[in-house]
Amino acid sequence: MEYLKIVGGKDISGSVEISGAKNAALPLIACTILGKNEITIGNLPNVVDINTFLKLILKLGGSFVKEENKVKINTSTINNTTATYDIVKTMRASILVLGPLLARFGHCEVSLPGGCAIGQRPVDLHLKALEQMGAKIEILQGYIKATAPNGLKGAKIVFDKVTVGGTENIVMAAALAHGVTTIINAAKEPEIVQLCEVLANSGVKIEGIGTSKIVIEGTGQKLIDIKPFDVIPDRIEAGTYMCAAAITNKKLKINKVIPLHLEAVISKLEEMNFEVLQDENSVTILPTNEIKPVNIITTEYPGFPTDMQAQFMALATQANGTSTIDERLFENRFMHVSELLRLGADIHLNGNIATINGKMGSLNGTDVMATDLRASSALVLAALVANGETNIHRIYHLDRGYENLEGKLSLIGADVKRSKED
C-alpha cells in the first residue's frame, strides 16, 4: 500500500491545470450504453473510478480503446446485462448502468452498490422512479433484478428529494423509453447538464436542461448516434486547488475551469477575505492579510457542495476565529475530523455541525489515515501548512478522484512524495 509524505511550509506559486470531471465522466460512460456507434470521449480524467467503470463496460460485453485522456467506447456488442458485485462493490456509481441497461434490453441485474464510506445513499429513489416507468423490480440475494419486457414507458417522476444519481439514471432511461418523461425536482448539477446536452446533441428531445423540471421524449428503444464530446472540467478538483492556494496564503492560477461552476466556492473564499480573479476559463487566488472565519451550509447545486466541505474545514483551521460547517446532505461525512485533530486542529462536533476554532500555524505533522476521497484531500491541504512532515496513509481513496495529485502539487512548489509502506 502507498502513502504520501508531505513536508509543510513550502511556498506554492504558478499555475495548475484542472482535469476532466470524474463525476461527469461516470454517467457519460454509462450513457454510451444507449449508443449504436463507437463513441469518442475527450478530456477524460485518468483516475481509478474511471478505469473501474470502463472495466464494467468490458464485463458487459462492450469494448474500449484508451489513449491518455481520450477513450473510444463501443457498446453495440454488449451481450450481458448483469453488473456483478466484484465491480459494483468498489464504486457506487456502477448503479448508473441500471437505467440505460433496462431501457435498452428490457431486463438487467445490478448488484446493490458499495464504494463510498460516507453514509447511506439508498437507491430507493432510482427504483421507485423506474417502477413508475413500468419496470418490475425485485431485490434478491443482493442484486436489483429489473424487467420491462416491452420497454420503459414515459411517466411523470417526482423525486421526494433531490438526487444526482437518480436524476442521471432516469434521464438515461427516459432517453430510450416509449413516450414522454417529466422529471420534477431534478438535480441541476453541471454534470447533469452535460449529460442532457450530450443526449440532446445526439438527437434526443430534451427540454428544461439545467432546471428542476426536465422533459424528455424517448426514442422507443431506438439506439442513438452519440456525437464525440469532451468532459467538462472538474469543479471539485478546481475547488481543492483553490483551497491549496488559500490555506498556504499564496497566489495561484487555476486553469481550464468554468468559473460559473465555482460560484459557491468563490463566494466563500471571498467571505474569508481572499480576492478571486476570474477569466473565461481560469481563476486566480490572491493572498490576504487575514484569513477570516466562515459559516458554511452544504446543499444541492448551485449551493455549496458537500464535496468541498472537508477542504474548507482544513482551510478554517488557519482562519482567525471560529467557523462552522453544517453538513445537510450526508451523514457520516465528518470522518476526517479525527485525523485533523491528530494534526492539532481544534474542532468540535455536534451532530451534523462542526465548529472549527482556527489559528494560523496551529497544525503539526504526524501520521494520518484517509477515510474517503474528499476527506483525504482535506488531509493533504492540512499537511501543506503543518509544521514538519505528515504521512497520509490509504491514499487509494485519493487516486479514485484526483489525477496526478502529487505531480500537480510538486509543480507548484509543494514537497510531496509517494512512497510504499514497509
UniProtKB/Swiss-Prot annotation:
Q: What is this protein called?
A: UDP-N-acetylglucosamine 1-carboxyvinyltransferase
> What top-level branch of life does the organism fall under?
Bacteria
EC number(s) of the enzyme? 2.5.1.7
Pathway-wise, it operates in: Cell wall biogenesis; peptidoglycan biosynthesis
Q: Where is the active site?
A: 116
Q: Name one GO biological process term.
A: peptidoglycan biosynthetic process
The question of whether Cell cycle is a record keyword is answered with yes
State its location(s): Cytoplasm
Where does this chain mainly localize?
cytoplasm
Q: Which family does it belong to?
A: Belongs to the EPSP synthase family. MurA subfamily.
Instruction: Spell out the Pfam families in the cross-references.
Output: EPSP_synthase
| Substrates-to-products reaction catalysed | phosphoenolpyruvate + UDP-N-acetyl-alpha-D-glucosamine = UDP-N-acetyl-3-O-(1-carboxyvinyl)-alpha-D-glucosamine + phosphate
Enzyme class, spelled out:
transferase
- What CDD domains does the annotation carry? UdpNAET (cd01555)
Q: Which residues carry this modification: 2-(S-cysteinyl)pyruvic acid O-phosphothioketal?
A: 116
Q: What does this protein do?
A: Cell wall formation. Adds enolpyruvyl to UDP-N-acetylglucosamine.
